[in-house]
A protein has these predicted regions:
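C-terminal cap/linker of serine protease catalytic domains
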Residues: 4, 13-14, 24-48, 53-56, ...
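PDZ domains, with a preference for the canonical peptide-binding region formed by the helix
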Residues: 16, 105, 313-316, 324-353
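A conserved glycine-rich beta-strand in the N-terminal activation segment of trypsin-fold
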Residues: 47-55, 70-96, 120-125, 148-150, ...
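PDZ/PDZ-like groove recognition
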Residues: 73, 207, 257-324, 328-335, ...
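Catalytic nucleophile loop of clan PA
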Residues: 92, 207-227, 297-303
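Flexible, gly/ser-rich surface segments that form the specificity/activation loops bordering the active-site cleft
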Residues: 149, 160-196, 235-237
Length: 373
């Protein structure tokens, strides 16, 4: 009889590789035998808080895997190119056959191998990819030892304890602990650079390293609240939020892609200087710097048409300031990104409340679909 996640003990996997011909030939790697000799390894004392992390780790780790991608050698203008390992990261079991990871982990591979925490390897194939959310789904040829992990429908408050499980630097079954440090962050989409940001991201102080990407950020009841994605320095890591996972992943499984709403505007944050230059009552809302020609907002919203000097700084003037969408307050750029990402679909008409020439008015904008990255 299959044991539940709560009954299965996790086994920390070692660094391992696999042949590009398949995923059954794991080779080499570091093990506990690599510990320094001549000194007794003393385990630290267990504290009152430790059992929480032990329990959640043992419940979650069988459902987490290391993801390794490979490419075949390709002909280039300089001759045959080198093939071999292309990318490495982590992933977690979303349902019985599908593993969620990051799009930047998957890339465009010829072979995907997944290593479970019992050190077995299985082949996987790409089901769907979404560069704009940096999420991807692969289908496994065989199951993992654990059960699918539940995904939260909302984000926990700042200060909630979390655990990140994955394969940093190829070290399968690794765990780091921390708290939720922030919510509603926006981070660059690494596989769609310079175009759009990932909305509603979760921030954590748990250590993230190369290879953690795609692994779950879980609360101490084993619920996924984020997918580890990026780090911006010591104790500053980010993950795709569970709310965005719930939006994107079902579509990737069903159709292989996800369509993001597109308003067709470039925006900047309203700070005190911009507010002063535009005679705004306070530094709140999102300033429309430009409108994409022939885009959804063209002819409806207004972008910058001048500039002013405030305290020696040049600020844009004349653009609309978005203060609400469908009656929901938009206080800053992350609010706008989050609402479009979680509450709308291409083709929806949204009521955009703006401050224009000192007065509020509400205008209808029918959203389009983001262009290909």
């Amino acid at each position: 009889m299959k044991r539940t996640r709560r009954e299965v003990l996790g086994v920390g996997a070692a660094i391992a590789g696999a042949s590009t011909a398949g995923c059954l030939g794991a080779i080499g790697g570091a093990t506990d035998d690599d510990a320094p000799r001549g000194k007794q390894q003393i385990e630290p004392p267990v504290t009152a808080d430790d059992p929480d992390y032990v329990d959640v780790y043992e419940a979650v780790v069988p459902s987490v895997a290391r993801v390794q991608t490979y490419v075949e050698s390709r002909e280039t203008v300089f001759g045959p190119g080198e093939g071999g390992a292309a990318g490495q990261g982590s992933g977690f079991l979303y349902d019985e056959t599908h593993l969620v990871t990051n799009d930047h982990v998957i890339g465009d591979p010829d072979t995907i191998c997944v290593q479970a925490t019992d050190e077995t390897w299985v082949n996987a194939t790409v089901v769907g990819r979404d560069p704009y959310s940096d999420l991807a789904v692969v289908e496994l040829d065989a199951g993992l030892p654990g059960d699918p992990l539940p995904v939260a429908t909302d984000l926990p408050p700042v200060g909630t304890r979390v655990l990140v499980v994955g394969a940093p630097l190829g070290l399968s079954g690794s765990a780091t602990q921390g708290i939720v440090s922030g919510r509603n962050r926006t981070i660059p989409a690494s596989t769609a650079p310079g175009r759009f940001s990932i909305a509603d991201a979760i921030q954590t102080d748990a250590a993230l390293n190369p290879g953690n990407s795609g692994g779950p950020i879980v609360t101490l009841d084993g619920t996924v609240v984020g997918v580890a994605t990026a780090t911006r320095g010591d104790n500053i890591g980010f993950g795709v939020s569970a709310r965005l996972v719930n939006e994107v992943v079902p579509a990737l499984i069903e159709t292989g892609s996800y369509d993001h709403s597109f308003m067709g505007v470039s925006v900047v944050r309203v700070d005190p200087l911009l507010a002063a230059g535009n005679d705004l009552p306070d530094a709140s809302g999102v300033y429309v710097a430009g409108v994409v020609a022939d885009g959804p907002a063209d002819g409806v919203l207004r972008g910058t048409d001048g500039e002013a000097t405030v305290d020696g700084a040049t600020v844009p003037t004349g653009g609309d300031v978005i203060v609400a969408l469908d009656g929901t307050e938009i206080a800053d750029n992350p609010d706008l990104s989050r609402y479009l990402a979680l509450e709308t679909d291409p083709g929806d008409t949204v009521a955009v409340t703006v401050v224009r020439d000192g007065s509020e008015e509400t205008l209808d904008v029918t959203l389009g679909e983001r262009p290909e990255p």
